[in-house]
């Protein structure tokens, strides 16, 4: 369970890390007593930044980072896979059974350009990820009124080609104390994000199972689709369309009256809006058998 400024949220992926001032994790019985069965796996309590008394302060932050694969799964190269296929063919010819689907004579034919390649598919579909984040915030206030406003933009180019994530968010936090015994405030969060993804399970399966000596392009330059029952990961990366646009808005208002140091009254009002729009297209080139 995630609690942001006292409000339970189903998903916190829209929160800008630069908006967070503190985070606490609860796993004891007290959390269950407060939040019930929803806290069975623990509670994450997040508090966002508030304005501080004083002159307005403007902060601009920019961060750039890189990401790479920490480990690559070892794969057989062309020579190793041909040797395996040769042993496999001889085994089936000797003992029967199986379904050998290639001829070593053809695969070793140096004039057959379609099979005379040595592909490292994982290397072909991955690259160094680039991440950029920009935040512009302003905060300040008086003894009675404090405010904090932050707008952030995050852009990530994925490690897998043609994947990525973008997010634009704005947070407006305000607190007003007209008297020593009355407090009120609001927390407004607006987020738009766009994700460009792929079916990673299908893609990585093709990377690990497709023979390295199968060409990815025909002589005319067009991409090979499904060949010999095996999908072409290069075609999957280039022709899969999978975009998800997410719109999120969260409005929170509180009103508090302190009767004494032991007793106070607090009312919370919260409204949430979520909308996801997904566009996905997988052409027959990457799903059907094309020779």
Task: Locate predicted features.
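N-terminal periplasmic accessory domains that precede
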Residues: 33, 39-62, 134-136
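Short sequence motifs at beta-strands and strand-loop junctions characteristic
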Residues: 36-37, 126-130, 139, 162-166, ...
């Amino acid at each position: 369970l995630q609690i942001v400024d006292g409000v339970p949220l189903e998903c916190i992926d829209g929160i800008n890390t630069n908006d967070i001032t503190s985070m606490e994790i609860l796993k004891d019985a007290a959390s269950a007593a407060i939040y019930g069965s929803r806290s069975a796996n623990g509670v994450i309590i997040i508090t966002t930044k508030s304005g501080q008394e004083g002159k307005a302060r403007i902060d601009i932050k920019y961060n750039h980072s890189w990401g790479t694969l920490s480990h690559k799964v070892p794969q057989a190269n062309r020579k190793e896979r041909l040797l395996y296929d040769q042993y496999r063919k001889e085994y089936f010819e000797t003992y029967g059974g199986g379904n050998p689907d290639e001829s070593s004579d053809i695969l070793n034919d140096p004039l057959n350009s379609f099979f005379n390649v040595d592909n490292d598919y994982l290397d072909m579909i991955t690259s160094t990820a680039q991440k950029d984040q920009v935040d512009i915030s302003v905060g300040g206030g008086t003894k009675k009124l404090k405010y904090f406003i932050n707008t952030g933009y995050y852009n990530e180019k994925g490690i897998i080609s043609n994947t990525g994530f973008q997010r634009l968010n704005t947070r407006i936090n305000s607190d007003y104390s007209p008297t020593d015994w009355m407090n009120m405030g609001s927390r407004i969060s607006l987020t738009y994000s766009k994700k460009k993804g792929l079916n990673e399970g299908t893609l990585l399966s093709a990377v690990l199972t497709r023979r390295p000596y199968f060409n990815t392009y025909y002589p005319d330059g067009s991409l090979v689709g499904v060949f010999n029952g095996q999908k072409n990961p290069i075609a999957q990366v280039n022709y899969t369309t999978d975009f998800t646009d997410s719109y999120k808005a969260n409005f929170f208002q509180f009103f508090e009256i302190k009767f004494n140091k032991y007793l106070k009254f607090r009312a919370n009002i919260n409204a949430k809006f979520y909308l996801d729009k997904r566009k996905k297209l997988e052409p027959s080139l990457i799903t059907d058998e094309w020779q």
